[in-house]
Regions:
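Cytosolic regulatory regions of ion transport systems
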Residues: 1-164
Length: 164
């Protein structure tokens, strides 16, 4: 396991949330970009050292190379005082395990990306039993949004209130 930080820069104390993002793919990188702009303290975890170093240098954040579901990796990332963990690796099972480990160790909110339809059907059960704040299926959400917009084709803007 290796940690990367942009050398030679002293970082001012951030006032936002401490957020761990597991997975440095497109979604993880986009989350880092958006959340770091909002002033949150971001730590990334991924097995790909090159990606971790690249993203850590671009956004001046801490990066850890390792398995995000590993207790020791999460401890190195500071899970005990983390506000939120978001797991967006390519593996649904790894995402669920990352969040489960985090919930057992720290008192943080946990969000897992789940793309398999079988798990998406059980999202409510998994969220409740694993104590997750949210389970997201991006493809399903995009399809729902498209259907909602197509249902009201002449609307300029479509907003949901309460639960839809």
């Amino acid at each position: 396991m290796f940690s990367f930080m942009n050398p030679g820069k002293s970082k001012p104390a951030k006032k936002g949330l401490k957020i761990i993002i597991v997975g440095c793919g497109k979604v993880g990188t986009t989350l880092v970009e958006q959340l770091s702009k909002e002033g949150h303290d971001i730590i990334i975890i991924d097995k790909n050292a090159k990606k971790v170093q690249e993203i850590a240098n671009i956004y001046d954040i801490m990066g850890i190379v390792g398995n995000g579901a590993s207790y020791s990796v999460q401890m190195d990332a500071g899970i005990e005082d983390t506000d939120l963990i978001i797991s967006v690796t390519e593996s649904d099972e790894l995402n669920l395990l990352c969040c489960t480990v985090a919930k057992q160790v720290g008192d943080c909110a946990a969000i897992a990306r789940v793309r398999t339809p079988d798990y998406s059907k059980e999202a409510g059960y998994l969220r409740e039993k694993l104590g997750l704040a949210m389970i997201i299926n991006p493809e399903l959400e995009a399809a729902r949004e498209a259907a909602r917009i197509l249902f009201l084709p002449s609307a300029l803007e479509v907003n949901s209130f309460a639960h839809g």
